């Protein structure tokens, strides 16, 4: 009988608790803690019999307004909680027995994990192994590098090893036990060799007087590099290429033998830059329109080829991309030291008058379409850059002067492009600016001032990327005669900003050697060239 009485007494006073909304030792983010809802179900709760609960938070008894007690348990909806460790406790009074006590300890953590790594990393020689070390907090739920789980030592240290510096940013992501996430990018730039060069068209190299003019500048130590056109603004490939599509579309015009030109220039100690005009390509656009390949071109709103520049090809089209990358790969195989992309953009003008077949746009707004074009330009450079980097060659991109201020107008977002090329070649020709631009009264008459103002803007936009700069310099006259003083002023403005790399531009390949002084031309290692 005594056992029976005791069993009945125990059943009447035993407390079974089920909690939802919080767990002991839980880790909550600030967001989770701001919307916390806790229910404590107490199966044997009998308020009339004296089985009554009292709730405490961080050692303080909660008032009746902060929670609700019913016949089935307690509901607690606290105000947003601060970061730190908290304790929720409950005491239930029982007749003739000590109170039943329960506690739930949990932490509110709204601070994302810290990823401590230097970016950009110091520039390293191209095609050499590189190691990057960093530190993260211990005890993370996950740590990934470019989407793959990464190893971390017991002190939170990590090490990344590469056969060579990868082109483009490396993405690090971390998540702590509370679910807070953090991300960081690592950019590893490569050392870009000192470059002072001139633009040379295929036709100019094939024309004896102009070729001799170029070689005289080389022999006089006026340049350390020569830029040769691989594919020009007219879409013409100026040598006998092995890329079949170039022949099929009628783009080949053999002005020179590429290998012979490269061998001659390298024998004289200068580097060779292969320039490829990417998406401004009349021959490819015409061929595409005549052969039911309209997805290869930018269209007007009536479905025809956009007439600007004689036809602009579509950066979102895989075949167009492949054609350009095939030409770049061939130029590298034949010996160029760099690939310099030009017209790696969309045409300027109202994007609502342009149709990009296959372009993935999240909504129908012009802003979304501009961003999608920007993303495709960047992804093209990332795609080509992987091929170029694998061959231990540099990749550059010529950018319109307005790209720093209005990238969406042409599809050239400077910060993103800077992370996917080895150098930017901004085209800041003084004659191309309107009066008052960058607060320069008469840019064409003030070459130093406009280059200093616009180039510094490019540098600000590219900050954090480690990208090098290689300035296009105006060596031609529009409106105001340009001679040695005007050409030199642009070079000096860049040098005063720490940019000593430059390329002279003259569409007719008739340059001003007297503009170049000995201290302006250096070997790739930065030392002065003999004869300069």
Question: Residue spans of the language-model regions?
Answer:
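Flexible, low-complexity linkers/stalks enriched in Thr/Pro that connect modular domains
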Residues: 8-20, 102-116, 186-193
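Surface-exposed, short loops/turns at beta-strand junctions within beta-sandwich domains
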Residues: 78-85, 161-168, 178
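Active-site-adjacent "subsite" loops/lids of carbohydrate-active enzymes
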Residues: 191-207, 279-330
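Glycine-rich, aromatic-flanked loop segments that form ligand/cofactor-binding clefts
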Residues: 225-227, 257-305, 338-342
